[in-house]
């Protein structure tokens, strides 16, 4: 009997010592299980760009969503910052928003923590251009939303524009011609300027390098989002352009500390495919949704 027990113990220890990690696909399936079952969620797209209502200098923005008004209408950085300084959404109620999602049968919420304008909807030590330090509102909307989501068992994910940032020095800019904005009499000169400046229209945007921006703003803010608000379900990147392979790898290494976080395919293409695809402006086929 002792010999049998000894053999069993030896086999058990051998299995423990030589056990291999789960196959990558199985790990992916395990992480994605809740996402596949959830099927229905809320994407909250909100920031100080809403103050313009799609109108600049009396002209309607000619193309695109309101969140693109700063770029398409070429609003100077100082002017946009001054407008953002008045952002004061005193009627915001995280509890109401989360319950609206829950009562509709939604299982998760994705919130725009920072869109391309560079304004952080959370308290950030990496940039003063945030809702707590820069506005009379003085409240951390992401914190309030995270607490309400935990209370009502709704998963929370963060949209974060990692490359484009039009107000923090060095942030990326995608070139849009003035014809997409408004009838500016200096449109030709502005278009020439953006052609020569990587899409930027304000000298403040080119006062630092993109690497400086990632080092001082984007990567520190990503760390803040991952550490300050409890369990994060999703990181929803946007604009996979100009970011270097090395920078994307650094962000991915940070994400490795949080294996539960699901990511999309917009960090850097094609090297960093993420967990699911994000077709836009069309109804996708099933094969176009997940890698």
Regions found by a protein language model. Give the residues of each.
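Sec-dependent N-terminal signal peptides
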Residues: 4-14
């Amino acid at each position: 009997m002792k010999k049998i027990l000894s053999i069993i113990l030896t086999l058990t220890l051998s299995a423990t010592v030589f056990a291999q990690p789960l196959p990558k696909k199985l790990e992916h399936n395990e992480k994605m299980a809740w996402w596949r079952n959830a099927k229905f969620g809320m994407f909250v797209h909100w920031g100080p760009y809403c103050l313009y209502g799609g109108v600049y200098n009396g002209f309607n923005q000619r193309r695109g969503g309101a969140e693109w008004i700063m770029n398409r209408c070429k609003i100077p950085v100082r002017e946009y910052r001054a407008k953002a300084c008045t952002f004061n959404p005193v009627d915001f109620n995280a509890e109401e928003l989360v319950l609206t999602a829950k009562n509709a049968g939604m299982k998760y919420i994705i919130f725009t923590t920072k869109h391309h304008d560079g304004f952080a909807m959370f308290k950030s030590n990496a940039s003063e251009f945030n809702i707590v330090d820069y506005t009379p509102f003085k409240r951390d909307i992401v914190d309030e939303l995270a607490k309400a989501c935990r209370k009502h068992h709704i998963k929370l994910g963060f949209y974060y524009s990692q490359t484009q940032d039009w107000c923090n020095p060095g942030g990326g800019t995608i070139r849009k011609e003035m014809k997409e904005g408004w009838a500016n009499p200096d449109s030709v000169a502005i278009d020439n300027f953006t052609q020569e400046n990587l899409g930027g229209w304000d000298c403040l945007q080119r006062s630092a390098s993109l690497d400086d921006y990632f080092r001082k703003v984007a990567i520190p803010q990503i760390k803040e989002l991952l550490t300050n608000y409890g369990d994060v379900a999703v990181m929803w990147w946007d604009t996979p352009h100009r970011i270097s392979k090395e920078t994307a790898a650094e962000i991915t290494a940070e994400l490795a500390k949080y294996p539960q976080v699901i990511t999309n395919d917009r960090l850097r293409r094609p090297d960093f495919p993420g967990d699911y695809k994000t077709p836009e402006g069309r109804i996708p086929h099933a094969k176009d949704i997940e890698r």
